[in-house]
Regions:
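Pre-Walker A (Motif I) flank of P-loop NTPase domains
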Residues: 30-34, 70-71
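N-terminal pre-Walker A segment at the start of P-loop NTPase domains
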Residues: 1-23
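Alpha-helix termination/capping residues and helix-transition junctions
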Residues: 30, 129-130, 168
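Conserved inter-motif catalytic segment of the P-loop NTP-binding fold
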Residues: 19, 24-25, 40, 60, ...
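Phosphate-binding/switch region of NTP-binding enzymes
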Residues: 35-36, 41, 46, 73-75, ...
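Gly/Ala-rich phosphate-binding loop of Rossmann-like dinucleotide-binding domains
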Residues: 56
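Hydrophobic positions on the alpha1 helix immediately C-terminal to the Walker A/P-loop
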Residues: 47, 51
Length: 184
């Protein structure tokens, strides 16, 4: 049936420990997913734009440490890049030459919306071509989930391609989420 043909195991004594690589030491790890959540209107997008500005300029983090300058890629299903995100980034002092917005997918002369379930490989190729991507922001992170966002298994399945992309590119993945009523 639908059983795995072989499960791979590794003994703990055979694991070679690797240090965590940090974008912002102690806060944003390279190749890992991070979630910034809060009630609507509490500044989540503003915080993420400030983080993006710090990365693009090689600026200082709130704790005074300096960021290594790099590129930032943003996929937003809620805010428009022209009237909201780019202006907020500019106000945050971002180097807009280092910011890239995922807009759509071209298939020949046709365009369609970006679909994480089927477009990770074209996105990975684009990120490799850009080079130096240190931060990938997805707002809201639930937009990467094609199934029921209230079912843990479907959420994990939907997010896994982004998590894998982040790990392979060694960039931090920052997902923005809104608390539902009664959970804040």
């Amino acid at each position: 049936g639908e059983y795995a043909s072989r499960v791979e195991l590794i003994r703990g004594c055979d694991v070679i420990p690797e240090p965590v690589q940090w974008i912002w030491p102690g806060w944003l790890a390279a190749g890992k997913m991070h979630v910034l959540g809060g009630a609507p209107g509490t500044g989540k997008t503003s915080i993420s734009m400030a983080l993006a500005a710090t990365v693009t300029t090689g600026g200082r983090w709130p704790d005074g440490t300096r960021s290594i300058a790099g590129n930032v890629v943003i996929w937003s299903g809620e805010d428009d890049h022209a009237d909201t995100l780019a202006p907020r980034l500019a106000l945050s002092g971002a180097d807009l030459t280092r910011v890239y917005f995922i807009t759509d997918i071209r298939e020949g002369s046709d365009r369609r919306s970006f679909d994480p379930a089927r477009d990770m490989e074209p996105l990975r190729r684009k990120l490799v071509a850009i080079g130096g991507v240190r931060l990938l922001i997805v707002d809201p992170i639930v937009s990467a989930v094609t199934g029921d966002s209230h079912k843990n298994a479907e959420v994990r399945r939907g997010l896994q391609p982004l998590v894998d992309l982040s790990a392979s590119m060694r960039c931090a993945l920052l997902g923005i989420t809104h608390f539902s009523k009664g959970t804040g």
